[in-house]
Amino acid sequence: MRSKYVLDWDAILRSAILLGFIILLIWLIKTEQLTLYINPKFSSMLEIAAYVLIPMLAAQLLTIYRPVAPLHEPHSHGSRWSYLPFIVVLLLAFALPDHVLNANLVGTKGLNSQTAASTMAVYEISRPLADKLRQAPLIKVTDKDYTEIMNELQFFTQDYVDKEITMTGFVFTPPGGTPRQFSLVRYVVVCCTADALPYGILCEVEDKAGYEEGMWLTVTGRIQQVPYEDKMVPSIKLTSVKKVPEPKAPYVFPPS
């Protein structure tokens, strides 16, 4: 007697979920949006994952039609509710717009709340850029060396007082600041955006009007030390401020 073939709805669901994740990963890779979610050093792992899912999808597609013994009715041994979390993740990923961490979360996460000195003595901090920065006529803060320069300014401010500096970040108004002060901030991502921490530096300007919370600026000025919350902190006395669009890669990543 010929075997009866029936649709296996569990296999169909698994195939749809795998296809959804493949499309999502390829889309994130092709549009270069992975850095909105993870550190670029992990991008290759997700690219490999996308290719690994393809043969898994092929294997599932081969099981969509299954032979059933004549005396047995087809039935599923698993609960289809177990697929719900994967379906929800896919729906949210495709339905919700990409969201970049902004100034609204800085107060919650704490500006400069976890610096190198929080876990080691200042004299133990690695200073790979110290000589270069001291000799440079202008300190240019780039995405690549952002965290190292911020650590230098945070813990060795005296080495750089009155040096000229230029950097880009978004505006955050810190509690306890004066009407002429704001912080210029970037989010530092170690692994993924869930562990992102805001790092920045205080800035002083003649007139803060027009510099809205979360606005991206490129600033130039001279490094100084100012009192803030009963301690001396690094600050930039601004000489030039330029409004800029949000960068395509808004986060910075510490060196490996």
Regions found by a protein language model. Give the residues of each.
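Membrane-embedded alpha-helical segments of integral membrane proteins
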Residues: 11-74, 78
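Short nucleic-acid-contacting surface segments enriched for D/E, G, S/T with interspersed K/R
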Residues: 49, 206-219
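Internal/C-terminal transmembrane anchor helices
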Residues: 75-101
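Membrane-interface segments at or immediately adjacent to transmembrane helices
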Residues: 99-161, 166-167
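OB-fold and OB-like beta-barrel modules that bind single-stranded nucleic acids
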Residues: 165-171, 214-224
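Short aromatic-glycine-enriched beta-strand elements
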Residues: 178-189, 232-235
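Beta-strand/loop nucleic-acid-binding surfaces
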Residues: 196-209
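OB-fold/S1-family single-stranded nucleic acid-binding modules
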Residues: 228-252
